[in-house]
């Protein structure tokens, strides 16, 4: 089995980030696994990344806002 390297920075130095799309509300997170960008839409996954990588540093108020938007 190959090792999975979960991180918030890929080889080109572009960091993962929370994002919001105006118009139709859209919240999520972008991160990198083995240098490949992935988009994450589920808040539980975002929280999982937060537990694995504390430097993601998502505030509780942001988590609540994301949760609210995803229930729409």
From Swiss-Prot:
<feature type="site" description="Interaction with the host cell wall">
    <location>
        <position position="30"/>
    </location>
</feature>
<feature type="site" description="Interaction with the host cell wall">
    <location>
        <position position="67"/>
    </location>
</feature>
<feature type="site" description="Interaction with the host cell wall">
    <location>
        <position position="37"/>
    </location>
</feature>
<protein>
    <recommendedName>
        <fullName>Endolysin PlyC, small cell-wall binding subunit</fullName>
    </recommendedName>
</protein>
<feature type="site" description="Interaction with the host cell wall">
    <location>
        <position position="29"/>
    </location>
</feature>
<dbReference type="InterPro" id="IPR053769">
    <property type="entry name" value="PlyC_sf"/>
</dbReference>
<keyword id="KW-1188">Viral release from host cell</keyword>
<keyword id="KW-0204">Cytolysis</keyword>
<dbReference type="GO" id="GO:0042802">
    <property type="term" value="F:identical protein binding"/>
</dbReference>
<keyword id="KW-0929">Antimicrobial</keyword>
<feature type="site" description="Interaction with the host cell wall">
    <location>
        <position position="60"/>
    </location>
</feature>
<keyword id="KW-0578">Host cell lysis by virus</keyword>
<dbReference type="InterPro" id="IPR048849">
    <property type="entry name" value="Endolysin_PlyC"/>
</dbReference>
<dbReference type="GO" id="GO:0031640">
    <property type="term" value="P:killing of cells of another organism"/>
</dbReference>
<dbReference type="Pfam" id="PF20821">
    <property type="entry name" value="C1_PlyCB"/>
</dbReference>
<comment type="subunit">
    <text>Homooctamer. Part of the PlyC holoenzyme, which is composed of 1 PLYCA and 8 PLYCB assembled into a ring structure.</text>
</comment>
<comment type="function">
    <text>Component of the endolysin PlyC that degrades the host peptidoglycans and participates with the holin protein in the sequential events which lead to the programmed host cell lysis releasing the mature viral particles. Once the holin has permeabilized the host cell membrane, the endolysin can reach the periplasm and breaking down the peptidoglycan layer. The small subunit PlyCB is responsible for the specific binding of the endolysin to the host cell-wall, probably to the rhamnose of group A streptococcal carbohydrates.</text>
</comment>
């Amino acid at each position: 089995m190959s090792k999975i390297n979960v991180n918030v920075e890929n080889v080109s130095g572009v960091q993962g980030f929370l994002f919001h799309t105006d118009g139709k509300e859209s919240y999520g997170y972008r991160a990198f696994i083995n240098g490949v960008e992935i988009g994450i839409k589920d808040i539980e996954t975002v929280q999982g990344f937060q537990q694995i990588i504390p430097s993601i540093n998502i505030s509780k108020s942001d988590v609540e806002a994301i949760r609210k938007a995803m229930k729409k």
